[in-house]
């Protein structure tokens, strides 16, 4: 793409008292008569990770056939049908440093590929996770180096699982072997991290009481910038701001029950949607906004916590997840686990379709992103860490070839995938934990130079 016009800086913001709104990539951000790929406005690569707890029923997860083009999906993965050409399924991946087979080590090793120190005290020790290795390089140019999200309040401390400290299953991201990064489950807090600026709890309390929109604080900047843009960019900016407002309204709806009561401390606001699906979709939509506005390029999201006793009555599973996962081969319980697995996949598919719907440069936001979806546990009934449920989605701006099934005859280290994903987004490492090499079949045949 070559655009002939004056350009705006890629990092253009709408600013007002208490708000800063980053903008998506606009045509006006491309310098006159310059190829898009040769400008600071060239589409950037994003890296994300979504964790699901307690493995899967792998018999209903694995696609039919051997390695090659992904031509059919399993029942559990069927929600990915609309984006099938954008995903790759990897079968027979192993997380060797997650043994001796606990929930805590499953979560801890998923992004670190490291062995957690066995302790229930504060002398915990793990390893820097792959997302934080990426953030050290990819986060230098963004408002937030990385964004850590979850669906559960991580307030349990002490010993959680077989003598392992709760910190191991509470936190996906570690910026160093001794520094876990807490995640955020409150949509309002995430929204304010992305778009809020300054202001005290009292200021936000006053704004909430008036049902004021954050966009009201940047109206003057919106009007000023609209005059500088062409019609296509005006439409793109309006659509983006409409999405910001729509997400804000959904947060307000969840908070509505608090308006008739004394407001709590807004440094830790309540207002999480009552329905799990609504909450998850809201958290995914916040990720879309964060990536589209280039607020961050690295995200982790824990869809549920290991040992979660959450039930899913909306899909006909009233029994708690964790006890059900110890199914003992009971066909009824196995079917319930498969239902939960498919439900979680459907939420990820929702997110991928949202990314696919956002045009960016010569492609879409999904084309420029690279996401790993999966678990650190394989079979939850026996707590093993082989044949993990793993999906890779996106194209990393042309570096990754999707629409494939990669099936190993012998277990392959998950660290190989981490190493490959880092390489695909431009972060070069010789090795990562127990990696034995990169996954060449994941790369685009176009090549990875640059």
Give, region by region, the residue ranges found by the protein language model.
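Ligand-binding pockets and gating/stacking loops
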Residues: 1-450
């Amino acid at each position: 793409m070559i655009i002939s016009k004056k350009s705006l800086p890629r990092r253009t913001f709408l600013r007002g008292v208490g708000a800063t709104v980053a903008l998506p990539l606009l045509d006006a951000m491309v310098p006159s008569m310059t190829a898009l790929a040769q400008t600071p406005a060239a589409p950037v690569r994003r890296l994300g990770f979504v964790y699901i707890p307690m493995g899967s029923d792998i018999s209903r997860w694995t696609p039919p056939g051997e390695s090659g083009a992904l031509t059919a999906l399993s029942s559990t993965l069927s929600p990915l049908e609309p984006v099938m050409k954008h995903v790759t399924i990897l079968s027979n991946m192993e997380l060797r440093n997650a043994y001796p087979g606990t929930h805590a080590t499953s979560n801890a090793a998923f992004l670190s590929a490291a062995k957690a120190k066995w302790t229930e005290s504060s002398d915990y020790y793990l390893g820097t996770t792959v997302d934080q290795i990426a953030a050290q390089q990819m986060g230098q140019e963004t408002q937030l180096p990385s964004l850590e999200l979850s669906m559960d309040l991580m307030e349990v401390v002490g010993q959680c699982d077989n003598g392992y400290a709760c910190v191991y299953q509470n936190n996906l991201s570690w910026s160093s072997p001794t520094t876990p990064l807490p995640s955020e489950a409150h949509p309002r807090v995430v929204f304010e991290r992305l778009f809020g600026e300054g202001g005290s709890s009292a200021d936000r309390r006053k704004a909430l009481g008036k049902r004021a929109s954050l966009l009201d604080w940047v109206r003057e900047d919106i009007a000023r910038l609209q005059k500088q843009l062409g019609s296509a960019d005006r439409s793109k900016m309006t659509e983006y701001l409409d999405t910001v407002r729509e997400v804000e309204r959904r947060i307000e709806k969840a908070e509505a029950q608090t308006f008739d009561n004394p407001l709590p401390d807004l440094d830790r606001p309540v207002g999480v949607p009552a329905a799990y699906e609504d909450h998850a979709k809201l958290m995914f939509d916040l990720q879309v906004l964060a990536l589209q506005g280039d607020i961050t390029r690295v995200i982790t999201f824990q869809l549920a916590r290991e040992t979660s006793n959450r039930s899913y009555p909306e899909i006909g599973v009233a029994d708690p997840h964790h006890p059900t996962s110890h199914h003992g081969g009971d066909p009824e319980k196995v079917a319930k686990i498969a239902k939960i697995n498919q439900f979680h996949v459907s939420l990820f598919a929702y997110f991928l379709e949202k990314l696919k719907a956002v045009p960016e440069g010569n492609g879409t936001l999904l084309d420029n992103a690279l996401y790993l979806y999966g678990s650190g546990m394989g079979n939850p009934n026996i707590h093993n860490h082989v044949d993990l449920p793993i999906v890779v989605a996106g194209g990393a701006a042309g570096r990754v070839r999707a629409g494939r099934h990669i099936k190993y005859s012998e277990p392959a280290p998950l660290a190989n995938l981490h190493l490959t994903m880092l390489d695909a987004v431009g972060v070069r490492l010789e090795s990562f934990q127990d990696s034995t090499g990169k996954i060449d079949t994941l790369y685009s045949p176009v090549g990875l130079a640059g």
